[in-house]
């Protein structure tokens, strides 16, 4: 029973770790399906994390924090769009530039406003954080060994943003494959000239895609600083935006396979946390440096085997111009 409990707790940790990855990966899916490379996922998440924590600490309301996080990420997304859609700049450079800018700007503003070394105040007041939602009969269900513990630990006790991320996958699949907007969005990423010939604005669709990406990155960043943690710290995204991009590529720009990739990466991250300081048979205690690198090593190995077979949208990374 103790082993089973540890497995359930590991799966619960996997869900919590997968949430920001999934939100960012679906955000990148909308953007890249429209033909815009989204290397700014990391920066948008980081900017949203700072804004959400700062506003939540200042106002005492996590909902104001969520709004600030989304607004910040959307602003950064539009900034990237202005550079690479309107002015047809290099999409990789635009995304990386925003990420580098936010990585320095967030701690600088935090130091100027709060004087806490680039951090925000701890979010320990009522209403400043997203807390777990206990579902009906969760406490009673713990007495039932298998389904009850799964219900009590996996389904119950998660915060609202986790449930939103879970609903996002079928929602994104429906939008992309069952709506006119999704059809046009995918067409822009494959053949923008055909879309333009049909009288549809290519740039307009791409801007809508990057705005959706900004909204979802805003939710992901807000989750990091107001749900997974109790405030903002420097570099708190820790490469999650790039892991989300890797999961998106591994999932071949499709919602359900991308969910599987996010869960796999999150499981290795959660497992790495559990393995720290634990003596394993034959090898003994694994060095903590190797354990921390495990999710990224797995990412490289998986992409080395699958990226060649993953077909990206044909027009991705290509600025559109009617003259060409």
Task: Give the ranges of each region predicted by the language model.
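Membrane-interfacial amphipathic/re-entrant helices at transmembrane-helix boundaries
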Residues: 1-24, 37, 51, 58-64
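Hydrophobic alpha-helical segments embedded in the membrane of multi-pass proteins
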Residues: 18-27, 43-50, 71-79, 189, ...
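Short, non-helical or kinked segments that cap or interrupt transmembrane helices
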Residues: 29-48, 85-98, 184, 208, ...
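Alpha-helical transmembrane segments within multi-pass membrane transporters and channels
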Residues: 60-107, 269
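Helix-loop-helix "hairpin" substructures at the membrane interface of multi-pass membrane proteins
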Residues: 153-232, 255-256, 260
């Amino acid at each position: 029973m103790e082993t089973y409990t540890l497995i359930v707790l590991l799966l619960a940790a996997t869900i919590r770790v997968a949430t920001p990855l999934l939100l960012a990966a679906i955000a990148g899916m909308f953007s890249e399906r429209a033909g815009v490379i989204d290397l700014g996922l990391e920066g948008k998440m980081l900017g949203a994390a700072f804004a959400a924590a700062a506003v939540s600490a200042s106002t005492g309301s996590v909902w104001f924090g969520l709004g600030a996080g989304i607004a910040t990420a959307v602003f950064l997304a539009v900034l990237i769009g202005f550079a690479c859609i309107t002015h047809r700049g290099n999409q990789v450079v635009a995304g990386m530039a925003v990420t580098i800018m936010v990585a320095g700007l967030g701690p600088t503003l935090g130091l100027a406003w709060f004087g806490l070394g680039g951090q925000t105040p701890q979010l320990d007041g009522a209403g400043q954080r997203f807390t777990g939602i206990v579902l009906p009969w969760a406490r009673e269900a713990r007495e039932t060994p298998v389904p009850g513990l799964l219900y009590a630990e996996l389904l119950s006790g998660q915060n609202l943003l986790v449930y939103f991320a879970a609903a996002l996958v079928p929602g994104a699949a429906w939008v992309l494959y069952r709506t006119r907007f999704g059809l046009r969005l995918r067409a822009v990423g494959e053949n923008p000239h055909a879309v333009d010939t049909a009288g549809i604005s290519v740039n307009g669709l791409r801007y809508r895609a990057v705005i959706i990406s900004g909204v979802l990155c805003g939710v992901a960043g807000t989750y990091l600083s107001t749900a997974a943690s109790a405030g903002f710290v420097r570099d708190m995204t820790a490469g999650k935006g790039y892991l989300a991009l890797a999961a998106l590529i591994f999932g071949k720009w499709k919602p359900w396979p991308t969910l599987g990739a996010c869960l796999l990466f999150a499981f290795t991250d959660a497992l790495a946390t559990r393995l720290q300081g634990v003596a394993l048979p034959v090898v003994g205690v694994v060095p903590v440096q190797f354990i921390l690198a495990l999710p990224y090593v797995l990412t490289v190995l998986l992409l080395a085997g699958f990226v060649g077979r993953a077909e990206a949208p044909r027009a991705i990374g290509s600025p559109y111009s009617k003259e060409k």
